[in-house]
Amino acid sequence: ILSASVAALCVFGVGFSASAYELNAEVKDVTPALREASTIGVWHHSNPDLQNLKNKDAILVMTFGTTFADTRAKTIDAVEAAIQKAHPDIPVFEAYTSHIIIDRVKAKEGIQKMTPEEAFSKLKAEGYTRVAVVSLDVIPGMEYSYDSIITKMQMSKFKELSLATPLMYFQGTEGEPDQVVDFLNAVKSQFPVMGKEDATLIMAHGTPHPGNAYYSVIQDRIEKLGMNNVFVYSVEGRPNLNDVIPKLKAKGFKNVTLMPIMMVAGDHANNDMAGDDPDSHKSILTKAGFKVNTYIHGLGENENVRALYIQRADEALAAFKK
């Protein structure tokens, strides 16, 4: 039913694209399921029953959230502010996808964060008819799947909906950009100056979702870019720290910098990675004979990364009908 090649259906600008598998010419009646299954890139839906409504646009940023107020201001809030600055005429709203974090922030700080459902209801009540959703996820894993599902559940309520891809999505196939390389070029400004005995370990979250395979792609691109002293590992997926330590020893590295590649520098960065407990990554590496430094900053603090999220917002807005 689907051909082997990917064809770009719409090109909105440099690096902006929404793609789909090219359907075989023999397919006469394209079912909604087939159309949905063949959609790649920015997702977009236009509700035929609401086309008479006036366009009133909003951007909704979806994030897992964090209970760390200091890193929230430097990361999530900073990304949202950057998107708002890039689109001054379109209001930016926010939704937290973690109900646990919503409850903890409310209890600790008295701040009420909205769930995605609450945010969509607010937008509907305030008369917004077109909503561009921007996910602050790094890869298309379990959390991005949740963002996708909950957005698609709103199709009957809005004239148009779109959902941007996460930070990394396309991998340079069929003329698409290699967003893994784009990501590495954005974060390499954080890497310390390294000598022959120095290595940097970038810590990802990890997931049981098949999207975990992106970490292998990241390592492949790291090597292709000649970053032979940079290694990716994850807290809850593969590769993990135990997979990387033998590589460090085999190459004779003695000094290691640990650095998270997560939106926020929250619990995983402060405790799992840089904590003083014997099972923290810092402690494990120190016990293994390495001198360890830590870089405790979330991706949202990086201006280059914020620029990539602005681009994701641009792509989601560009999907709307003119």
Where are these regions (language model features)?
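Extended amphipathic ligand-handling, pore-lining, and cofactor/metal-binding catalytic surfaces
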Residues: 21-257, 263-322
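Sec-dependent N-terminal signal peptides of Gram-positive bacterial secreted proteins and lipoproteins
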Residues: 1-19
